[in-house]
Amino acid sequence: MKLASNTPDWVLAALEERRQQDLMRRTITLDSPQIPHTQIHSQDYTAFCSNDYLGLANHPKLIKALNDTAQAYGVGGGSSHLVCGHLAPHQALEEALADWLGYERVMLFSTGYMANLGVISALADKNRPIVQDKLNHASLIDGALLAQAPLRRYLHGDVASAQKLIARSAAGGLLITDGVFSMDGDIAPLTELSQLANQHDWMFMVDDAHGLGCLGENGRGCLALEGLDATSLPILVGTLGKAFGTAGAFVATSNDYADYLTQFARPYVYTTAMSPAIAGATLASLQLIQSAEGQERRDRLARHITYFRQRVQMLPVALMPSNTAIQPIVIGDSKAAIEISEQLKTLGIWCTAIRPPTVPAGSARLRITLSAAHSDEDLVLLCDSLEKVLTAKLLNAKRLNLK
């Protein structure tokens, strides 16, 4: 017997609308560690949808560091950084990150979402407007909404569009962009945006969640790739759950900005610090990223990207202009993207379909992500499978058009 529900009609209607549009999201449970050869519902797959770009999430050195730090400092942070939750592993990680990136200070946050909410809501308000890229991550948009600041979004990657929006404001504000865009994989024109912010005396903030660890000299991300520093890029946000293979986030900035954020960034002030064990594991990850092994992993990832693009450019799809680990194939229709994703699963490839509202309407896609942990054979399997599925779909479409 079906139990009576007190769920509001508008909730049920919203869910039904998502179902009708093939946009329902669901959780998938892995039965294995975060590795390329994964197991889902007792089925074996080669996964191409993780953000573990360097393959460090299951690295034995990180596991050992996490265990050792937990033995010494426990598992829980216990409190916010400002009460009694800032332990020695947190301090060591902050100092190491600051030294690596060339900033005066680093502040740890529990998630990248919280870092962006904290920084933006503290620095912008009704009198300090925000101008940001139209394809920025949701957390950057939500930070602006939380700040209740005037928000204008410029055309993707278009510095001239950003210039026009900044010129409309008499007051100084905050210019924000992703470093690497999470759904397209392209890199923002950071040098030009930095110059624009400096020209108009605006603050400049970059979220380099998908660049740090993978790009630039010593893995220092878009900062190094674009030749920027702590002066030309005064507020840098990085996440630790991607190339670092752990969890959490940080803000790299000046002493003055860090002191200000310590007072006014509410998601920093009013939340428990990340686990000290995670901080210890992340420090081990940073050491790996800076080592010869880290460079070898970046080189292997770059080879995978080159091979993938060479193979896929011969298929009946348009490649996006990305030279990063994120290699999307835009399908367009949500239902078609789901069908292709399901067909790939039958060939042992796990690659999720990304649909609106995560991406703009009409641009549903396969968000393929590559990792240094993938083998050459994994890449061959992926490209062979894509060729089989996409070619068959094109032939079927031609048959339907002939009828």
UniProtKB/Swiss-Prot annotation:
Residues reported to bind substrate: 25, 137, 358
PANTHER family, sorted: 8-AMINO-7-OXONONANOATE SYNTHASE, CLASS II AMINOTRANSFERASE/8-AMINO-7-OXONONANOATE SYNTHASE
Organism expressing this protein natively: Marinomonas sp. (strain MWYL1)
InterPro entries assigned: Aminotrans_II_pyridoxalP_BS (IPR001917), Aminotransferase_I/II_large (IPR004839), AON_synthase_class-II (IPR050087), AONS_Archaea/Proteobacteria (IPR004723), AONS_Proteobacteria (IPR022834), PyrdxlP-dep_Trfase (IPR015424), PyrdxlP-dep_Trfase_major (IPR015421), PyrdxlP-dep_Trfase_small (IPR015422)
N6-(pyridoxal phosphate)lysine: residues bearing it: 242
Cofactor entry: pyridoxal 5'-phosphate
Reaction(s) catalysed (UniProt annotation): 6-carboxyhexanoyl-[ACP] + L-alanine + H(+) = (8S)-8-amino-7-oxononanoate + holo-[ACP] + CO2
Protein name as it appears in the record: 8-amino-7-oxononanoate synthase
Described purpose of this protein according to its UniProt entry: Catalyzes the decarboxylative condensation of pimeloyl-[acyl-carrier protein] and L-alanine to produce 8-amino-7-oxononanoate (AON), [acyl-carrier protein], and carbon dioxide.
Binding site for pyridoxal 5'-phosphate: 112-113, 182, 210, 239
